Amino acid sequence: MSISSEETFATGSLPLDPIQKGTSILLTGEDADALESVFYKLSAPQADERGVIVSTDESGRSTLRSLDRVSRGSKSRSSVLAAAGSGRDDSVETISDLSDLTMLGMTLSSVLAESQQLEPRFRCGIYLCSTICSEVEDVRSVYRLLNSNFLSELRRGDGLGVCAIDTSADIGANMQSIVAGMKTSFKVHIDVEKTGSREATLSISGLADSDDSVTVAL
């Protein structure tokens, strides 16, 4: 039985079937450039969607430009919560303390609610969750943020969520254990392995009607 386009999200240039709404994707990889490329391909909102991005390492303006490179016009449909740079744009909220996950969660939920008033369909991304893990004393607080704010908004709304983790990052904890713990909360896991200067292999689990492994251009 086919699923209507209103029930799915297109994947742009990625060789993946449209993804059903409500899907949460844990995106991992140890090459930052490859991980970033795939993240924005999944997170850039299309014409009938809004985008909300938590950006831990780039300014809001840089994040908006990255979205627009993937889908022209998407920066005008997006809001960014940025821990780097300054918020001089109506589309950018500044995260003053990345370790204050209570405030981050409240702000994320508020921005998502505002976005859904403009357009019910949304894409929400966190880049990079590994940076958030490195800023907190107890990684379990990150799990609570994801479950209480990020994943719960996907379950309630008409959205697609992408949470990216740089597995090469030093977060002061066992990365393999962190990823294993987070995988239990996400519907889909995609691991990105760079295999050439402009090429990567995606190892996929949990995504119906898609191959277990696909090659993508970066």
What are these regions (language model features)?
Residues 2-68:
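Glycine-rich P-loop/Walker A and Walker A-like loops and their local beta1-loop-alpha1 context
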Residues 25-30, 53-56, 81-83, 125-127, ...:
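Conserved beta-strand segments of the P-loop GTPase G domain that flank and frequently precede/overlap
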Residues 31-34, 59-60, 130-139, 168-172:
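Short acidic, S/G/P-rich loop/turn micro-motifs used as interaction or catalytic elements
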Residues 50, 120-123, 155-165:
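Loop/turn-to-beta-strand initiation segments
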Residues 58, 67-96:
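Nucleotide-state-sensitive switch-loop elements of NTP-binding domains
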Residues 61-73, 174-182:
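Short, aromatic/basic amphipathic alpha-helical patches
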Residues 86-151:
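Phosphate-binding/switch loop-helix module in NTP-utilizing enzymes
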Residues 164-218:
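Phosphate-binding/switch region of NTP-binding enzymes
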